[in-house]
Amino acid sequence: MRKPKITVIGGGTGSPVILKSLREKDVEIAAIVTVADDGGSSGELRKNMQQLTPPGDLRNVLVAMSDMPKFYEKVFQYRFSEDAGAFAGHPLGNLIIAGLSEMQGSTYNAMQLLSKFFHTTGKIYPSSDHPLTLHAVFQDGTEVAGESHIVDHRGIIDNVYVTNALNDDTPLASRRVVQTILESDMIVLGPGSLFTSILPNIVIKEIGRALLETKAEIAYVCNIMTQRGETEHFTDSDHVEVLHRHLGRPFIDTVLVNIEKVPQEYMNSNRFDEYLVQVEHDFVGLCKQVSRVISSNFLRLENGGAFHDGDLIVDELMRIIQVKK
């Protein structure tokens, strides 16, 4: 019997949570990862290697999908100290991806090589072969370019789009990305930052078109917390409305939302300064936009913060896959 094909689209720290749990299931996995990050280590590397697609999100996905020994993972994720000169703040894995990207001619080729080297379960694709610049248009008409600048701007985002960071060419999807979406049985969006992790992938026209054309079940894992500079005062229904608006029509079939209350002591704005309050649940609003709403306890409290429990999310995804067979 053919294994179900599940593709996860996103970036940041959210997608790896789902991918890590999917590895334990009898499915074929693919990850499509944003290349619009311009902050931190990825941003510094982009300045020095203009052809490089930012490696940070790809690095985290690679670790999540790999069966590398724990020590290898610690080496790959090791971040140089602040007194390490030009290397300060860079994870070793980012430098390895950057070096292999240059050696292999592209980040796409580098990820295929690293996937073999670290025995990943599934395929990893950058959403585009070229670094992208994310642009946000705010409701007051202001436009801000660059992911790191967008989150610092005070205002309500109306829409986002991406441009090729190297030239005026239209951003194109990376090799095999469109085919992977069209051949999938399920597409999972999120969890992750709505405007800076998920949308930078799907506003690439080829990817957006593929999502509208695919026969796959499309599931969106809504964030647990609102995010400063992105989704302040958002309900879960608002998140879905934004996604649908960017592609011009509804395309999400299922939404998974956490309804377990986050204890006040886990809303640590000092440690997790981008998070504000728990996303408000709007069941009626969701039902108007999608055919299936799964409201449950998907909460994992860890290290002083509120996160998704990947195993609980994936269990629900597998139930949907079984029903669709």
Swiss-Prot record:
Lineage: superkingdom: Bacteria
GO cellular component annotations of the record: cytoplasm
Gene3D superfamilies, alphabetized: CofD-like domains (3.40.50.10680)
Subcellular location: Cytoplasm
Pfam families: CofD
A molecular-function term among this protein's GO annotations: LPPG:FO 2-phospho-L-lactate transferase activity
GO biological process, one term: regulation of cell shape
Coarse class of the protein's main subcellular location: cytoplasm
Swiss-Prot/TrEMBL keywords: Cytoplasm
Disulfide bonds: none
Family: Belongs to the gluconeogenesis factor family.
NCBIfam families registered for this protein in UniProt: CofD_related
PANTHER family: GLUCONEOGENESIS FACTOR-RELATED, UNCHARACTERIZED PROTEIN YVCK-RELATED
Primary role: Required for morphogenesis under gluconeogenic growth conditions.
Matching HAMAP family: Gluconeogen_factor
Stated name of the protein: Putative gluconeogenesis factor
Species this chain originates from: Streptococcus pneumoniae serotype 4 (strain ATCC BAA-334 / TIGR4)
